[in-house]
């Protein structure tokens, strides 16, 4: 795949602010996924949950595709046959392999340590963006990343402890996979409509995880997720934690630099922290407050601060 160095024309300030809001919403919705998954995994095996999430998400996105207007930039919705291999790569690499590694990494290393490793995403995305897309690293981006990542460390680092070595390796592999896919997605969505690429990628993921779901259902007795409370949360996960944020993430990647998108990633643990306190009655610590303040500062500075070349 040829990585395009140049992106679209520089966005107006008003458009940039709108995209920043979309990025904040995207990462906040992903942050709520941790709380929802914690509830669903009590009744649904992990790959069954993943497959149902993708199947429902694909259905929702297909319905939306039928009623949406054409892309304002005129990008095609029909993907050429020679480019489908990249869509399969996005689906298998970004939505199956990366998430699967994250799930098993969390299981082996522990949730706190896995979350701490996941905070490396902005750094790795910026590294690949500079290396492959030749994006410029500015002083503002460095300050934002340092502030946000250190804030995320404050939130989850206190309880990280020591984890299984394989779990740590799998968690790092998940970060590398997702970051690399995000950078390639930035290049690919310069050519095709972002929502179409997302929809097709999620269909690939749904098909790929279907055999895993069938195996889990055949080997796991007593699986019952048809209770209304599970169905409602599953629909929330499929639409609000998958279809909407994945589409917004890929759309944002098509409009602004990948390294800029990565600055909003630490909003995830901040959202997870707030929901954990409000819904799961988790204890609020000084580290939580410090981390939250640093993340908010990083996000605000990324949207309001002036650029300086590093």
Q: Where on the chain are the PLM-derived regions?
A:
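Juxtamembrane helix-entry segments on the extracytoplasmic side of multipass membrane proteins
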Residues: 15-20, 43-47, 51, 79-84, ...
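Hydrophobic/small/kink-forming positions within alpha-helical transmembrane segments
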Residues: 28-31, 35, 62, 91-96, ...
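Transmembrane alpha-helical segments that form core, pore/gating elements
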Residues: 47, 61, 125-126, 131, ...
